Amino acid sequence: MGQKSNPNGLRLGIIKNWDSKWFANFKKTPQFIHEDFCIRNFINKNYSKALIAQIEIERSKKKDKEIIKINLHVAKSNIINGKDNESLKKITKQIEQITKKEVFFNVIEIKNPDKVAILVAKTMAEQLEQRFYFRRVQKMAIQKVLKTGVKGVKTLISGRLGGLEMARSEGYLEGRVPLNTLRADVEYAFTEAHTTYGSFGVKVWIFHGDVLPGETILDTRKPFAIKSNYISKNNKKSNNYKGDK
């Protein structure tokens, strides 16, 4: 059944962690889930050009005040930060208006976007919308991903390929992508491309390697220094943050 299920959801709690990290009683859970949905929808809709890979939301309480911390993993941090962090301050105020809570932002720049499945899928979708040939799009994407040193990559595009009336699917596989092995660090992403021939579905699987007992994904993937800005209501910057993607 590993072929049919979402590889990200199948590995949650085993080698992967949740994007929303908080605890709440049953009365507040629906409210928090709705707030998380609104936050992610707002950021993805208004700042898609920044190539957003992941939005992590953490909640805490300090002196009867609810605080939301958002870790934003992006490929183009300049679009989010803007000049003198003006864009970041604007996003913070807008999300505070939506949630009515104090919001802290941590922008984490991804050093190698070709290694992240969702960014590869978004790039492929953008090329399809620019009328690139679907086979060329997949081969170019696979070549770039393999240069990063991953163990395997798989792509699949579905829709009216080549403008034909009958929809079909076509994909490529290079290396090894073990979907049934739970310790395998398989990253999966899906997005859509809207073209003159209709909507195309784009799927990408990237195999980073096996996660051994006692290790996590962060241990197996090589860490690197990144730039980040941490902005609150008081517009204070935190120390440089080091993360991994």
Curated annotation (Swiss-Prot):
Database matches in InterPro entries: KH_dom-like_a/b, KH_dom_type_2, KH_sf_prok-type, Ribosomal_S3_C_sf, Ribosomal_uS3_bac-typ, Ribosomal_uS3_C, Ribosomal_uS3_CS
Listed GO biological process terms: translation
GO molecular function list: mRNA binding; rRNA binding; structural constituent of ribosome
GO CC, any one term: cytosolic small ribosomal subunit
Keywords of this entry: Ribonucleoprotein, Ribosomal protein, RNA-binding, rRNA-binding
Domain (KH type-2) ranges: 39-111
Family membership noted in the UniProt record: Belongs to the universal ribosomal protein uS3 family.
Function: Binds the lower part of the 30S subunit head. Binds mRNA in the 70S ribosome, positioning it for translation.
Listed PANTHER family: 30S/40S RIBOSOMAL PROTEIN S3, SMALL RIBOSOMAL SUBUNIT PROTEIN US3C
Subunit details: Part of the 30S ribosomal subunit. Forms a tight complex with proteins S10 and S14.
Protein name: Small ribosomal subunit protein uS3
The gene coding this protein: rpsC
